[in-house]
């Protein structure tokens, strides 16, 4: 049994609140249970170890219940308490894929991801905090191992959301709601909807409050709390996304009051103590429809061998103070969300689009990183300070690209842009030389008409105008992380962990099956060599997509674990405080004298990682809903459009294609390919026509048309496009499955 060590007795601090006392007691209990000489103790024994008076037993029991519900402690036989991992119980957050499989990200960052089969997920939903009993035969949970861990959900610690959007339907004897989210595995049984502001009709989109769900083998029960309207009613599609992802349409009145109280202009009192950069040639470069300008730059030639670069970032922390209504709401939202038809901002427009936005021809407050950079792109020095600027010009990326594609004019700002391009390209080459991975893919932007229908789909390419700003922001993020780490300040870092070795091995086998040389991908240099090799191959884009799927997802953490994709040991987010709460935290950590505690930052880092993923899912779904309607209209017309596509995966039932023109993927079922009967070759991972010996393999380029849209499952099936001048469907590439040499010649 653990001995009393003569520590400070845990007494109630004079004048402290109950919450503060509870937090102190929680910390003491967790510290005690983590000691190497601790043996499982019951409540009376814990009272002695913590040096608590006997009359505080009820208080201790209440704290233990809270800790147990949070997954921070576990109760075992004899009502004794231990750390959960000692009982093979792991608390963490579960993420579900659309096939129903779960993946637990343990709270303990030293533990590997845990895979949870669909049958073992219990009643967990996507992004719930859960307690998982690990499979004791699996070694993947031990620190430093690479084998995958497996487990089973034994308890829901915290529901991420209890409100679910779906379609109201009727069975023989009861009403039910089919969830829009395919990761919810069952329909939800509901009683006859009560009066919630508008009548509910079968087929309507509704919001359900989840009430009971006892077992994964039974249907959950709920209650309709809001009727959104018919699915084809204008605006209902986006309202469904807003409700499904709990995105607020409006700010609370106290938040708006604080935002409006900041005023509309920078005053002399705001400028006091700042470096005056208003005479500098400061500019912003953003998308043509942007309104929240987070960042600005200025470049100046110091000598033949040196440049001075100023990276100015909007000083949101000057206006949004810790503990205010503005700060509380910003933290709750975590980030701005960019849906296909609107922005759900993190901050009210009085700040995001006005006083904090680095608009041209007005004074604005910034946090500045000033670099001294060698001619070859190496950073020689960086310093940090609050500043005031007066932006000279606002550019769109398209305008900058047009300037960079022509010869420099006498205009000093245009000359600066040409110089910035040359310098940032050198910086970019150094970054890739250091191991940064080239994982850029063209993106798309959907433009809507006044009725919310797709007008056109535009491709966004990461050209030199984007790269110019990207390299400046990466430099600033790295420099700030370096400064924070050198000062040992509690902060939040942007981390992208090294991929799981098992996934890399599986991916390497896929590459080798395509007869492409591939070394040990646990070495970043080999990954770079492979990606460079793939850029020159027709199959390359498909395999690059496969590599992306093998990577970990970037997140926020209080530990500076580095960024694998960027090959940076020190990295954070500093450059977008208008739209990311993480950056606002980092501004405070860098410049404020009173820093937040590590425990508070850890909780915030997990929260904003969740809100970031939530926003990404909402943004994707908002685009998909518009695309589904767009493709359904094509089917109804009888003349669906033709789209270039790339085969990204081959299965025995068909092949998946990526359609860049739609920014989406889908299945081409074999049942729709009518020119032959195709057999799946497991060894070569391709499909071979039994009669013609034609081959369908990874990386093939085809032309497809939409064949089926399933809005419930959020899936689109394609078919090979019908040739304009032929009666039959397009044939797959005519390649013989047994002749590798002839295939390589055609490439």
Question: Which residues are covered by each model-predicted region?
Answer:
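Basic Arg/Gly/Lys-rich low-complexity intrinsically disordered segments
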Residues: 1, 11, 16, 20-22, ...
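Charge-lined substrate channels and their catalytic hotspots, especially those that engage the 3′ end
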Residues: 10, 18-310, 317-363, 394-395, ...
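Non-cytosolic beta-sheet module surface loops
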Residues: 94-96, 168, 646-649, 708-710
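A short macromolecule-binding patch
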Residues: 111-116, 184-191, 663-681
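Internal insertion modules embedded within essential enzymes
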Residues: 143, 166, 217, 708-720
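Electropositive polyanion-binding surfaces
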Residues: 193, 202, 207, 212-214, ...
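C-terminal functional regions that serve as terminal interaction/effector modules
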Residues: 695-696, 700, 708
């Amino acid at each position: 049994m653990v001995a009393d060590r003569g520590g400070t007795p845990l007494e109630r601090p004079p004048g402290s609140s109950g919450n503060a006392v509870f937090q102190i007691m929680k910390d003491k209990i967790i510290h005690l249970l983590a000691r190497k000489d601790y043996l499982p103790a019951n409540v009376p024994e814990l009272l002695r170890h913590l040096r608590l008076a006997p009359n505080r037993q009820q208080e201790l029991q209440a704290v233990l219940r809270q800790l147990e519900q949070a997954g921070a402690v576990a109760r075992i036989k004899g009502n004794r308490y231990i750390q959960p991992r000692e009982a093979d119980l792991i608390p963490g957050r579960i993420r579900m894929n659309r096939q129903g499989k779960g993946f637990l990200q343990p709270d303990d960052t030293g533990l590997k991801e845990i895979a949870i089969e669909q049958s073992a997920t219990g009643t967990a939903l996507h992004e719930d905090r859960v307690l998982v009993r690990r499979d004791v035969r699996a070694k993947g949970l031990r620190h430093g191992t690479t084998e995958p861990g497996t487990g089973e959900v034994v308890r829901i610690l915290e529901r991420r959301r209890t409100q679910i959007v779906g379609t109201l339907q009727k069975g023989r004897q009861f009403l039910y709601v089919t969830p829009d989210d395919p990761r919810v595995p069952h329909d939800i049984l509901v009683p006859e909807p009560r009066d919630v502001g508008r009548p509910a009709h079968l087929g309507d989109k509704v919001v359900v409050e989840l009430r009971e769900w006892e077992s994964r083998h039974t249907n959950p029960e709920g209650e309709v709390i809001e009727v959104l309207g018919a699915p084809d009613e204008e605006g209902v599609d986006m309202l469904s996304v807003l409700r499904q992802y709990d995105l607020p349409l409006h700010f609370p009145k106290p938040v708006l009051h604080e935002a409006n109280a900041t005023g509309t202009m920078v005053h002399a009192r705001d400028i006091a103590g700042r470096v005056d950069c208003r005479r500098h040639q400061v500019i912003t470069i953003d998308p043509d429809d942007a309104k929240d300008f987070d960042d600005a730059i200025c470049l100046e030639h110091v000598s033949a061998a040196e440049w001075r670069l100023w990276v100015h970032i909007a000083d949101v922390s000057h206006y949004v103070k810790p503990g205010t209504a503005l700060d509380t709401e910003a933290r709750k939202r975590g980030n701005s969300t960019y849906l296909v038809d609107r922005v759900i901002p993190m901050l009210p427009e009085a700040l995001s689009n006005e006083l904090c936005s680095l608009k041209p021809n007005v004074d604005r407050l910034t946090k500045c990183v000033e670099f001294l950079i060698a001619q070859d792109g190496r950073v020689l020095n960086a310093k940090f300070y609050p500043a005031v600027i007066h932006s000279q010009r606002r550019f769109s990326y398209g305008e900058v690209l047009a300037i960079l594609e022509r010869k420099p004019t006498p205009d000093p700002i245009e000359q600066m842009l040409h110089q910035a391009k040359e310098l940032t390209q050198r910086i970019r080459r150094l970054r890739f030389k250091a191991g940064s991975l080239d994982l850029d893919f063209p993106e798309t932007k959907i433009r809507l008409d006044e009725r919310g229908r797709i007008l056109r789909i535009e491709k966004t390419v990461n050209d030199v105008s984007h790269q110019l700003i990207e390299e400046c922001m990466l430099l600033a993020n790295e420099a700030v992380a370096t400064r924070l780490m050198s000062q040992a300040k509690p902060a939040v870092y942007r981390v992208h962990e090294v991929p799981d070795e098992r996934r890399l091995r599986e991916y390497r086998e896929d590459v080798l099956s395509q007869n492409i040389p591939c070394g040990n991908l646990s070495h970043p240099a080999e990954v770079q060599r492979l990606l460079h090799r793939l850029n020159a191959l027709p199959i390359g884009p498909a395999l690059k997509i496969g590599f992306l799927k093998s990577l970990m997802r970037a997140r926020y953490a209080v530990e500076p674990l580095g960024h694998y994709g960027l090959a940076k040991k020190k990295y954070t987010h500093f450059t977008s405080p208008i739209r990311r709460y993480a950056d606002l935290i980092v501004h405070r950590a860098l410049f404020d004298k009173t820093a937040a505690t590590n425990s508070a930052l850890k909780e915030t880092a997990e929260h904003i990682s969740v809100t970031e993923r939530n926003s990404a899912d909402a943004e994707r779904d908002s685009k998909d809903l518009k695309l589904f309607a767009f493709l359904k209209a094509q089917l109804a017309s009888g003349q669906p459009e033709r789209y270039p596509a790339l085969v990204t995966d081959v299965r025995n039932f068909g092949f998946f294609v990526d359609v860049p023109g739609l920014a989406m993927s889908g299945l081409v079922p074999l049942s729709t390919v009518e020119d032959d009967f195709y057999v799946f070759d497991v060894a070569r991972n391709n499909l071979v026509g039994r009669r013609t010996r034609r081959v369908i393999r990874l990386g093939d380029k085809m032309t497809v048309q939409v064949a089926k849209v399933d809005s419930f499952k959020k899936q689109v099936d394609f078919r090979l496009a019908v040739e304009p001048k032929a009666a039959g469907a397009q044939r797959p590439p005519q390649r013989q499955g047994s002749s590798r040499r002839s295939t390589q010649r055609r490439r």
